[in-house]
């Protein structure tokens, strides 16, 4: 790979396998597996912190693998990103939407960013006082990690499951394997580890979305 910097072309040789990222993947899956397996002896505040951390960490790892890491083989990378530890977010939808955002001329346009919270002054001005107050709260740090996180999950499911119910074949082709993956995750969590679904959602899924919202708060 050739990279141009300050008028000079620097040749960069990318390794066939980026072993630090492979090692990080093992840490993430191992940590998640350990927390779920021994959840009964872990105080719930620590379980919530650790569960949210490892699932959010996997979401960050998904961002790396969709950009071609840690190997040169897409199928291997996708296999690392695919496991639906969040339950609600299909990796292939995240991959499709994120790469679509990177492949157009609107990369830095806040209105086109799939993670944007931006409203034009004209649109904001048409809102009533209550709506403006709510949006100001949502754009605070606390608002992002609480209501913003929950709203994001609910809105995502509303839109994409609605497409499935209307027979959108592209969505169905993504959600079918995703639901199989969810079944495997829950077979481990509920069947092997004997953790209730509600505990997994409260201690892993929701906290991970809140942690992931911190990045979007800093960027948007």
Name each model-derived stretch.
Residues 1-54, 84-202:
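Non-catalytic, topology-defining segments of multipass membrane proteins
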Residues 55-74, 94-107, 215, 219-220:
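Acidic (Asp/Glu-rich) catalytic motifs at the cytosolic membrane interface
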Residues 76-83:
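Select transmembrane alpha-helical segments in multipass membrane proteins
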